[in-house]
Amino acid sequence: MENKLTIYNTLSRQKELFVPLHAPHVGMYVCGPTVYGDAHLGHARPAITFDILFRYLTHLGYKVRYVRNITDVGHLEHDADEGEDKIAKKARLEQLEPMEVVQYYLNRYHKAMEALNVLPPSIEPHASGHIIEQIELVEEILKNGYAYESEGSVYFDVAKYNKDHHYGKLSGRNLDDVLNTTRELDGQSEKRNPADFALWKCAQPEHIMRWPSPWSNGFPGWHCECTAMGKKYLGEHFDIHGGGMDLIFPHHECEIAQSVASQGDDMVHYWMHNNMITINGQKMGKSYGNFINLDEFFHGTHKLLTQAYSPMTIRFFILQAHYRSTVDFSNEALQAAEKGLERLTEAVKGLERITPATQTTGIEGVKDLREKCYTAMNDDLNSPIVIAHLFDGARMINTVLDKKATISAEDLEELKSMFHLFMYEILGLKEEAANNEAHEEAYGKVVDMLLEQRMKAKANKDWATSDKIRDELAALGFEVKDTKDGFTWKLNK
């Protein structure tokens, strides 16, 4: 298949044809979560966005090594160089070991990702497991003159780097702007410049997580982990680095600076960023206190939710917008997504009820849908356009089911194949099990109603109807027992 995939490169600010450095191999690194709390809708978006990319690249025949890290050390409060480590703080408040906090929330993150049908990455490295690599990175930057030691900590010299290179090329900022918007915080006097960022921090006596280094017992700066682990697993140069748009500055800007300062050039060819989930126009996030975690969505337990929403409803809701567009949360939007997904799912089920005719009449464009979906995917993963084409296909199916059109066996198989490929394999949607409480309650009411009709038939000595209801239910797996008070039943699974 000819490669026509274009992706928006944040670095060049334009769509570019995707050309892997070492085809058919593709290296992709995505910033994963800092595991000090439950994953929320904002965490679901990058996971789903880059899951789509992973799935599509794999479908196109590439051998993708997908690395998504786990931040379990070094991420300080407010994404700054001072303050308490987010995980260490949670551990202190909960009276747990930091790695207990990490493991608990990592297990819950994995469970949520599995529910959302997000494929696991090829490698999921932990920052705490790569301290040696991060120390080696800091040593290289020091050796090349772009960092300095101060009171046991090591800082990146942004001004020195900017003289030789361009600090701010990813975010479009210049150093003067950065300096004017960087606050001088207490305890930052050891920095030469407020814009300098920590590569290694000397740990205070109360800091739980610490490792020996040439400079002090301490811990790596937040930005080091991705540069070090990206290099370890994908090499000095790799294809794609992704993450949320909120990471462009400072995190990814600092990653580029670290890469250039340590090895002389940028490691990454394409930088990709998904936009934010918002609530009333404000970014959803733990630090804003306005987030709804995924478990609350799945069970409808948050005060802002009017009902529970299934994992596939959440996935479909996110895919209805292009990954570079903002998505504003509302119950109305989620309910519309729920209904839309149900329409598509019912249409796919309807395919199995269609008897093919000798030719297709009354509908046009069956064979064009596949190419249209490919065109949309190749246009920077334009999932909302793919979904629009799937709805076109659903309308064709419903027209045939309503006996207003006919479809040939060849076109019927094409629709089945096209829906399976784009809806399930590439967009990663799936049919959800119908054994939830709402469905079970509905089934129970129907069975009770039938058995009440059977009781009336027995009372009227209509044995034929009574036996027919019992036998039909038995054929469906329902075991019915008559009692002196009426009846009991159970479903034999």
UniProtKB/Swiss-Prot annotation:
InterPro entries associated with the record: Cys-tRNA-ligase (IPR015803), Cys-tRNA-synt_Ia_DALR (IPR015273), Cys-tRNA/MSH_ligase (IPR024909), CysS_C (IPR056411), Rossmann-like_a/b/a_fold (IPR014729), tRNA-synt_1_cat_dom (IPR032678), tRNAsynth_Ia_anticodon-bd (IPR009080)
Cofactor binding description: Binds 1 zinc ion per subunit.
UniProt keywords, alphabetically: Aminoacyl-tRNA synthetase, ATP-binding, Cytoplasm, Ligase, Metal-binding, Nucleotide-binding, Protein biosynthesis, Zinc
Localisation per UniProt entry: Cytoplasm
Pfam family name, one: DALR_2
Residues annotated for ATP binding in this entry: 286
Name used for this protein in its record: Cysteine--tRNA ligase
Phylogenetic classification of the source organism: Bacteria, Pseudomonadati, Bacteroidota, Bacteroidia, Bacteroidales
